[in-house]
Structures are given as C-alpha cells and as structure tokens.
Amino acid sequence: MARLEDLPLRDDLKGQQPYGAPQLEVPVSLNVNENTHRVPLEVAEDIIERLAKSLMSINRYPDREFMSLREALAAYLGAGLTSENIWAANGSNEVLQHIFQAFGGPGRKFLSFTPTYSMYPIIASGTQTEYVSVSRGDRFELTPEFIRKAILQHKPNIVILCSPNNPTGTPLGLDCIEAAYQAITEASGGILVVDEAYQEFGADPSVTAVSLLPGRERLLVS
C-alpha cells in the first residue's frame, strides 16, 4: 500500500500533521464542547420519531439550502435575523473552511491572536492563506487598542476572534469586536469572523457578537 509521502502531495502540505483532539472516557470533557447531561428521554423519543419519518424519503437528497434549519437558527438567535442571514454546514469547521475558500487563498493573509483554536492555521494552510500569529501576552487578554494596532499593521484579509477563547476561556468584550471591525474595514476591507463555539458557556451568554451584525456586512459569527 502506498504511503502518503509516496503520492503527489502539495509541497506545502508535506510533513504537516492533521488536527486531532484527545478522546478520553471522562465525566467532563471541556475540550470538545460537550454537554455533560444526557439527552432527556422525551427528547430522544421525539428525535427517533422524526428520524423514522425522514427515512421514508432517504432515497432523495435533503434540502440543499437547509431552509428549515436556517429558519430555526434565526428564530433562536433573534437580533432581527432571517434565514437569509444564516448559513448552515456540517459543524463550525466546515463553515470556516468555506470562509477561507471564499476570502482567503494565495496572496491573502489571515490573522488571529494566539494561543487560540488550533484548527485555524490548519484551514489556512489547506487554502494556501498566509497565517499571521499575534501573541496575546501573559494573561491572554485582548484590548481594543491592541487588536486595532495588530490589524492595521498586518492588513489581513481575514481576522478570527474566538470568544470565549479556546483554549484559555478568555472572554472578549463587544468593544474589542467593534474595534476589530473598524480596523479591518480601514486596513483591507476584509472579513471579521467571531467564533462563538463556546458562547453559551461564557459568564454572560447574552453578550454575543450577533447583536453587532446589523449594519456590518463584513462581520460573520460562527
């Protein structure tokens, strides 16, 4: 059997390691965004019933536009959003992949503040987007001024802010997001992504970048 290094792999991908996360049998697994409570029986029964109905049409492709899901997500998020403001995919990583495919690529730059989610540079590498890493410092905190300075200096096409940050848990104020949006608009006219994968686990789940979406067409929240 041929090994990967024997195949015509892109030079920039040779020697790279795939993303991975420990899969441990432990009561609380914070690194994978899991709920520690089991699914209630009545919820499980409802899911099973709906799956059974769906199986009757499994010979056909599902709705490619995910309209029912997008409408439900818009209702859940509020902030005046409609299904037209929502995109759905197979997890947040696929959404981020789509963003890099559309707005990154050769000759373009992506900036994030490290340490942060280790999947970001992997997606950047896969799309041949230059990765710019800016250190958060000793307490892992960010300020509007610090964010603005980094963006204006490097002029990235994509900026991702993770809130609360993975793996440090550091929250991010809305003032930081507003500063980042203003800076990237001035610097490159690029895209600002706020990754809120752990937003519901934050100290105040009501504080979300979703509230900043109206009027900011280059702001995306995943």
Residue ranges of predicted features:
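Active-site pre-lysine segment of PLP-dependent enzymes
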Residues: L142-H154, P167-S222
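Short glycine-rich anion-binding loops that position phosphate/pyrophosphate groups of nucleotides
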Residues: N33-T36, S92-N93, Y117, S163-T168, ...
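PLP-dependent aminotransferase-like
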Residues: A102-L161
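Glycine/Thr-rich phosphate-binding loops of Rossmann-like dinucleotide-binding domains
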Residues: R38-P40, L96-Q97, Y120-P121, T168-G169, ...
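N-terminal small-domain helix-loop-helix segment of the aminotransferase-like
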Residues: A2-G91, H98
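Short N-terminal helix/helix-N-cap motif within the alpha/beta-hydrolase-1
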Residues: G91, Q97, T114-P115, G202-D204
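Short acidic capping loops at alpha-helix termini that bridge into adjacent secondary structure
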Residues: L81-I86, G107-K109, E196, E217-R218
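Short beta-strands and strand-loop turn motifs
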Residues: N31, Y131-S135, I158-N165, L192-E196
